[in-house]
């Protein structure tokens, strides 16, 4: 993999991780479209380390306050939210361990990705229409953590989108658009950190080259900008834009797949 390819994939990861369009799907589709070698799941996880840096850099004050409150004052508002986020991370971690092999093989099919992009895009649009969109982060409770956490477990399938499925679940529990996005971003910290640590400890040091580092740094910078954009956009916009994009991308996948037969 060249440095340019790594930078492109880092850009794709930075945008796709936080916008509800599925970073894992785009990391599979980009090499497929351009006929590049598949970088594999380990490089995917390394790029997630870049977006972990992005979310920690953006929310570092919130994260410190949540951790201190969770450990020192677990009954406080921030303390409870900290433990809700931990609970929400458990289903995704379990599914990630149980279905790791499938994530590396059958779940990487372009046609399956086209299907999940479409279905979850429609699901996000529906949730945005029917959700009450009244509840803020201070209103989140344990039930919300469980529901959003269970939904996150489905994100192991490329095309579902971790941010997309958790925002969908958040909207269905009555969260405001921006609140659903913030909760999704904060709960990404433990799940991404866990996945990255598990995979990176298996990574041979000789594979950590300039391309590898360039991809991670690009994902971090672009991811930070993507978070800022989405939170500002959702104050006045809806999720319909992302539904339309997902459906158009799914149609493009099917067309390319058919032409290459």
UniProtKB/Swiss-Prot annotation:
Key words of the record: Antibiotic resistance, Cell membrane, Cell shape, Cell wall biogenesis/degradation, Hydrolase, Membrane, Peptidoglycan synthesis, Transmembrane, Transmembrane helix
Enzyme Commission number, as recorded: 3.6.1.27
InterPro entries: UppP (IPR003824)
Superkingdom field: Bacteria
GO cellular component, one term: plasma membrane
Lipid bilayer topology: Multi-pass membrane protein
Cellular compartment(s): Cell membrane
Other noteworthy facts: Bacitracin is thought to be involved in the inhibition of peptidoglycan synthesis by sequestering undecaprenyl diphosphate, thereby reducing the pool of lipid carrier available.
Known function: Catalyzes the dephosphorylation of undecaprenyl diphosphate (UPP). Confers resistance to bacitracin.
Designated name of the protein: Undecaprenyl-diphosphatase
């Amino acid at each position: 993999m060249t440095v340019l390819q790594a930078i492109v994939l880092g850009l794709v990861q930075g945008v796709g991780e936080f916008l509800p369009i599925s970073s894992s799907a785009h990391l599979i589709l980009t090499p497929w479209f351009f006929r590049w070698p598949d970088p594999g799941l380990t490089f995917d996880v390394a790029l997630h380390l870049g977006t972990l840096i992005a979310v920690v850099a953006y929310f570092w004050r919130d994260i410190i306050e949540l951790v201190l409150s969770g450990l020192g004052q677990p009954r406080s508002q921030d303390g409870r939210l900290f433990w809700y986020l931990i609970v929400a991370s458990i289903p995704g971690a379990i599914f990630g361990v149980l279905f790791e092999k499938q994530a590396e093989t059958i779940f990487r099919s372009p046609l399956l990705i086209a299907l999940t992009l479409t279905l979850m895009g429609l699901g996000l649009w529906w949730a945005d229409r029917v959700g009450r969109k009244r509840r803020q982060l201070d209103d989140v409770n344990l039930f919300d953590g469980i529901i959003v956490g269970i939904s996150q477990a489905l994100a192991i399938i490329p095309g579902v989108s971790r941010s997309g499925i958790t925002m969908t679940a958040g909207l269905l529990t009555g969260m405001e658009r921006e609140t659903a996005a913030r909760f999704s971003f904060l709960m990404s910290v433990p799940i991404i950190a866990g996945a990255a640590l598990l995979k990176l400890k298996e990574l041979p040091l000789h594979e950590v080259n300039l391309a590898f580092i360039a991809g991670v740094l690009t994902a971090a910078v672009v991811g930070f900008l993507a978070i800022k954009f989405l939170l500002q956009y959702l104050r006045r916009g809806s999720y319909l834009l992302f539904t339309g994009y997902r459906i158009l991308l799914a149609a493009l996948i099917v067309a390319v797949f058919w032409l290459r037969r």
